[in-house]
């Protein structure tokens, strides 16, 4: 496995981009280093959030959380398997933060990735509104996270968002970035973690785990109640996982302390 490129990391020093000969030297295409990954993050985020929003808007009350859980998890796994080798397949600001902390993404690309993911979320949520019957759209609050209605629910919802996002980000970083544990089933395990998270915590916080997934529908539906939970929780979780891997559970290359040499 050590010879494989980590799917959810992007090391610019190892990018196998198109090389063009100029003045006797080879240079790596700047487009494939900087622009193409951001385009893919925008595209993947738009597709993922479109499917996720539509699964909530069209969800039958009889199915409970099953339809959104399967749609979100399967869509994310499929999109990562399809596009992950170009951008790393993050499609989530919390994931990008963690991958940056553990050295899988250049710091200079973190903000462009976030911008791409957020705009992708806006596009996906807007497309979901366009294709959805108006009554169903508004009945579902446009797939915005409206489950937290009272101040008393905030602590539980924030705690659940942090814990659920930790599981998701661990699946990404350990399955697709950390060389010692990465493997070909990473897209499956990442998608499966989303399914499990939504089934477990959807009734408490909505199981967002992704600020871009929260922001797009909030803008389109104009629903901002307790919106900050879905930024603070996932980003704290991403930072925590990044530090956990950097300090304790990462491989020799990633870990900053307790090295053998």
Curated annotation (Swiss-Prot):
Biological processes, Gene Ontology terms: ammonium import across plasma membrane; ammonium transmembrane transport; B cell differentiation; cellular detoxification; hydrogen peroxide transmembrane transport; methylammonium transmembrane transport; methylammonium transport; regulation of cholesterol biosynthetic process
Glycosylation, residue list: 139
Entries under Gene3D superfamilies matching the protein: Glycerol uptake facilitator protein
Cytoplasmic side: 1-36, 106-107, 178-183, 250-261
Domain of life, source organism: Eukaryota
Ways its activity is controlled: Reversibly gated by a two-step sulfenylation-persulfidation process in cells undergoing diverse stresses.
Catalyzed chemical reaction(s): H2O(in) = H2O(out); H2O2(out) = H2O2(in); formamide(out) = formamide(in); methylamine(out) = methylamine(in)
Transmembrane segment boundaries: 37-57, 85-105, 108-128, 157-177, 184-204, 229-249
Principal subcellular localisation of the protein: membrane
Compartments in which it is found: Cell membrane; Mitochondrion inner membrane; Apical cell membrane; Basolateral cell membrane
A Pfam entry, by short name: MIP
The keyword Transmembrane helix is assigned to this record: yes
Protein keywords: Cell membrane, Endoplasmic reticulum, Glycoprotein, Membrane, Mitochondrion, Mitochondrion inner membrane, Oxidation, Repeat, Transmembrane, Transmembrane helix, Transport
Cysteine sulfenic acid (-SOH), modified sites: 53
Short sequence motif named NPA 2, residue ranges: 210-212
InterPro entries according to UniProt: Aquaporin-like, Aquaporin_8, Aquaporin_transptr, MIP, MIP_CS
Record-annotated disulphide pairs: none
Regions of this protein lying in the Extracellular compartment: 58-84, 129-156, 205-228
UniProt motif (NPA 1) ranges: 92-94
Domain notes: Aquaporins contain two tandem repeats each containing three membrane-spanning domains and a pore-forming loop with the signature motif Asn-Pro-Ala (NPA).
PANTHER family with a match to the protein in the record: AQUAPORIN-8
Its biological purpose: Channel that allows the facilitated permeation of water and uncharged molecules, such as hydrogen peroxide and the neutral form of ammonia (NH3), through cellular membranes such as plasma membrane, inner mitochondrial membrane and endoplasmic reticulum membrane of several tissues. The transport of ammonia neutral form induces a parallel transport of proton, at alkaline pH when the concentration of ammonia is high. However, it is unclear whether the transport of proton takes place via the aquaporin or via an endogenous pathway.
Name the UniProt record assigns to this protein: Aquaporin-8
Organism: Notomys alexis
Gene transcribed to yield this protein: AQP8
């Amino acid at each position: 496995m050590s010879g494989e490129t980590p799917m959810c990391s992007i090391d610019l020093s190892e990018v196998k981009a198109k090389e063009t000969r100029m003045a006797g030297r080879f240079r790596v295409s700047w487009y494939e280093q900087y622009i193409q990954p951001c385009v893919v993050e925008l595209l993947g985020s738009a597709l993922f959030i479109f499917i996720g929003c539509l699964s909530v808007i069209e969800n039958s009350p009889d199915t409970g959380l099953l339809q959104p859980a399967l749609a979100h998890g399967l869509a994310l796994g499929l999109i990562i398997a399809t596009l992950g080798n170009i951008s790393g397949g993050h499609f989530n600001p919390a994931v990008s933060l963690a991958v940056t902390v553990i050295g899988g993404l250049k710091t200079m690309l973190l903000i462009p990735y976030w911008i791409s993911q957020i705009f992708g979320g806006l596009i996906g949520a807007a497309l979901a509104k366009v294709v959805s019957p108006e009554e169903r759209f508004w009945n579902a609050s446009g797939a915005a996270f409206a489950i937290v209605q009272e101040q008393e629910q905030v602590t539980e919802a924030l705690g659940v968002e942090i814990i659920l996002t930790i599981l998701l980000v661990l699946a990404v970083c350990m399955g697709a970035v950390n060389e010692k544990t990465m493997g070909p089933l990473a897209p499956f395990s990442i998608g499966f973690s989303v399914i499990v998270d939504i089934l477990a915590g959807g009734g408490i916080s909505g199981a967002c785990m992704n600020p871009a997934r929260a922001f797009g529908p909030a803008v389109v539906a104009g629903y901002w109640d307790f919106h900050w939970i879905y930024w603070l929780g996932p980003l704290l979780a991403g930072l925590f996982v990044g530090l956990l891997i950097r300090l304790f559970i990462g491989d020799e290359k990633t870990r900053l302390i307790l090295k053998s040499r």
